[in-house]
From Swiss-Prot:
Residues 852-874 are annotated as: Disordered. The lineage of its organism: Eukaryota, Viridiplantae, Streptophyta, Embryophyta, Tracheophyta. One of its GO terms (molecular function) is ATP hydrolysis activity. Coiled coil: none annotated. It comes from Brassica napus. Its main location: plastid. May interact with a ClpP-like protease involved in degradation of denatured proteins in the chloroplast. InterPro entries: AAA+_ATPase, ATPase_AAA_core, Clp_ATPase_C, Clp_N_dom_sf, Clp_R_dom, ClpA/B, ClpA/B_CS1, ClpA/B_CS2. Residues 204-451 are annotated as: I. Keywords: ATP-binding, Chaperone, Chloroplast, Nucleotide-binding, Plastid, Repeat, Transit peptide. Residues 865-874 have a biased composition (Acidic residues). It is found in: Plastid, Chloroplast. This is ATP-dependent Clp protease ATP-binding subunit ClpA homolog, chloroplastic.
Amino acid sequence: VAVGNNVLDTLGRSRQSFGGKVRQAMNVPKGKGSRGVVKAMFERFTEKAIKVIMLAQEEARRLGHNFVGTEQILLGLIGEGTGIAAKVLKSMGINLKDARVEVEKIIGRGSGFVAVEIPFTPRAKRVLELSLEEARQLGHNYIGSEHLLLGLLREGEGVAARVLENLGADPSNIRTQVIRMVGENNEVTANVGGGSGTNKMPTLEEYGTNLTKLAEEGKLDPVVGRHPQIERVVQILGRRTKNNPCLIGEPGVGKTAIAEGLAQRIASGVVRETSEGKKVITLDMGLLAAGTKYRGEFEERVKKLMEEIKQSDEIILFIDEVHTLIGAGAAEGAIDAANILKPALARGELQCIGATTLDEYRKHIEKDPALERRFQPVKVPEPTVDETIQILKGLRERYEIHHKLRYTDESLVAAAQLSYQYISDRFLPDRAIDLMDEAGSRVRLRHAQVPEEARELEKELRQITKENEAVRGQDFEKAGTLRDREIELRAEVSAIQAKGKEMSKAESETGDEGPMVTESDIQHIVSSWTGILVEKVSTDESDLLLKMEETLHKRVIGQDEAVKAISRAIRRARVGLKNPNRPIASFIFFGPTGVGKSELAKALAAYYFGCEEAMIRLDMSEFMERHTVSKLIGSPPGYVGYTEPPQLTEAVRRRPYTVVLFDEIEKAHPDVFNMMLQILEDGRLTNSKGRTVDFKNTLLIMTSNVGSSVIEKGGRRIGFDLDYEKDSSYNRIKSLVTQELKQYFRPEFLNRLDEMILFRQLTKLEVKEIADILLQELFERLKKKEVELQVTERFKERVVDEGYNPSYGARPLRRAIMRLLEDSMEEKMLAREIKEGDSVIVDVDSEGKVTVLNGGSGTPTTSLEEQEDSLPVA
């Protein structure tokens, strides 16, 4: 038993340590000359053969011998017990006990002192070498216990031969039995694999997968469409020379599926006679190269592979990612797989289908014209949306079986259409299949959830189990009560779960075929992937969209034209009426400073996209020099910053549904506008790495102060004239400013914008409304410090008088509030005259000075309640 345990422990170690032990035991130096021999000794040993050698060493230790001879190997073969060798010896009536007795009779026991590493005798080394030869003769690329026994018998001399003779075994009979059992084993594995008789293609079976066999067993997904490509592949395969098609297409368009489609056609017999009876075998290049540590080993594998294919004449080799052939196995002057295969590929000895992407084909295969001419390119285009829908319908059944649910026709159409429209950096049908798969997973998880009541009971059950374990050793009465409650809870949980199962069973019996994946599930997955709202407009959201102007006006005072234009654009996009190949909308806001151009963009981002951070803001004053354009799309290769992410394209890739604000657009270098032409017209831009970024779901807003001087000169009367005069003055100024814009920006840039919106100068009444908003923000900040602030109407008038300047908009108002109110407040707060919990009133005295009073020491002219009624909520 001790021997067995030691062996099982040792078996857990790596083959490398075993190889080292064998090398040491055989006293073979680790130089170059010995590598091939030593590799042959231990690299190909099966687990059972390793176990035999370990057992042989244990037997040597048990007998106290300082060597492993043929007799110890024989004892190891018998002791292993499960291999072919052990079974044959057992059938001959040879057991471990008798064999040990015979060995002890012949060589006796040793001195008792045994070295850690026990060496092999020259005869034992000879047995190992002969076992390798026996394996080669049988066409095996491994050494098992049966090969060790054959090597032992072939040696014919030594203690082991005498032991077998003494036990009455006939070596030739043993050899016959071993070869017969090896043949039977091969027949069984060959029949299971679908071959006939012995294993004629061990290398192909080891490094390849038979797609035709998988197709016969129905394990491949159905291939829908792609008839022209499959026909062209069959046509090329039927050529006399250079009969090697190479499938070239973008990732995810279905190149591997074409090879699977060919395998399915061959399996079903629907194929031309030139390809009838063929086998499509896909080669695993990683597995082929794995473990080839020694020079020439990789080449040897490839040559064996080619020989097997030539002999068979019915193999079509499929190499996915065919560019991996180039450089595979090439180390220190060794030739790579591509160069080994070239002669066979040109002469038509090898039928090979390759598959690779356009980029990899250009990067690797086109650089080697000798390899390129041997492959006939077959372009695999991306399927259209209609073709993708047909593909999804073909795959529907497989996914329904996997997820245990049903897909509606609408959900499949939505998966194809929405993936085409919104997931721009991937290709059909891959992105549509992924949508369909994840939607199925989501629906299944939603229906598999435990009922809420059962979850609560399970939570209580865990708590009681924990308490029960804590009190079990001390308070038996409490432990008993807890145990009873635990049993009750378990029964309740089981009852709820059983009820759920009965309900689902009843549903299936009444014809309800389980959960359904609908269009809304697909829409939800698209939203979670991209952040784009594609669900149908709900009732709540339609109210939100209809009241958009009203909500935006709470933050942006005046500027009706701009607010209406933005609201119209958002409604068009959400209802689905916008052009799908252009951005949601593109505006340029121009007008005097401080009238709400940037504020409107921020308000829109906060209101509709959730938060102000949802906006991508680019301050164009940072792009005043020509070379700074590279910040937007990335530096070209070879320049500093090539590895850094571009500011614009990367931000839009991360968040494709957003507002992009180009602030102070006229400050940028004119070359920046050239880059923006494609964004405005086609909704796309290519970054420095060649990746196309989609701007079709962005709202582009540019702000500019061009024409401020014209507005200031011609617009002094805006806000003070009668209504009809107001409009005529506004239109007159707009035409003047548009003329100035045309002088500054190129016509092709202005022509691509949806609308150019002039912001009006603010009137005094509008400035007063803005003052209410700014004061309300200050009240909110002070509330967090538990200070209640009120201002009188007189103070408010003073702030508006000081803060109103038609040329500068609302910004002077902020400075006036800072100077008149915030400065007075901070002095009082630092002097501890105003503390937490105080109610403060700010007024203006008869001399025009600002006074700050605590609630008890003065009476405000406007109470807080009255004030809040008159203030819009921020």
